[in-house]
Amino acid sequence: RWEWLITLNMIAKQHIHAGRNVVISCSALRSAYRDVLTKDIAPHCHFIYLHASQSVLSARLKQREHFFNGDAMLESQFAALELPSKDNAFIIDVTQTFECVSQQAEDFIHPLISN
């Protein structure tokens, strides 16, 4: 995991230094993981935290036809989760409609990438 996070950070640095925008999608459950991702590029990094309760996510996972690793995996992820604060992440409640969630994400991202 650590090598993968370090590699993502290095690739992000290369793109940022070349003047390009980067989007990384991963769980980054722990603060230490987010610290590795943002090392030396923190001012350029912004997190979006898609928030839902464990029960909401469990119900959604059970509705998937071809993917569900069971409640144990979800429980372990919630146990490992170190919630980001509003100071270091834009938090979106994903119990809203998909359209509402995607619009909020777009509204947050657009000013960051508009040069």
Segments predicted by a language model, with ranges:
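Generic C-terminal helix-cap and adjacent flexible tail
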Residues: D107-N115
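Amphipathic alpha-helical transducer elements in NTP-driven molecular machines
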Residues: R1-N9, H51, D71, E75-F78, ...
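Small-molecule kinase domains that catalyze NTP-dependent phosphoryl transfer to phosphate-bearing small molecules
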Residues: Q63-E106
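Short amphipathic alpha-helical segments
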Residues: R34-T38, A59-K62, Q103-A105
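ATP-dependent small-molecule kinase phosphotransfer cores
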Residues: R1-D40, S55, F67
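Small/polar loops that bind or transfer phosphate-bearing groups
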Residues: S25-C26, Y49-L50, D93-V94
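Conserved phosphate-donor/acceptor-positioning beta-strand/loop module used by diverse small-molecule
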Residues: I41-R60
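Structured helix-beta-strand junction loops
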Residues: A18-G19, H44, R64, D87
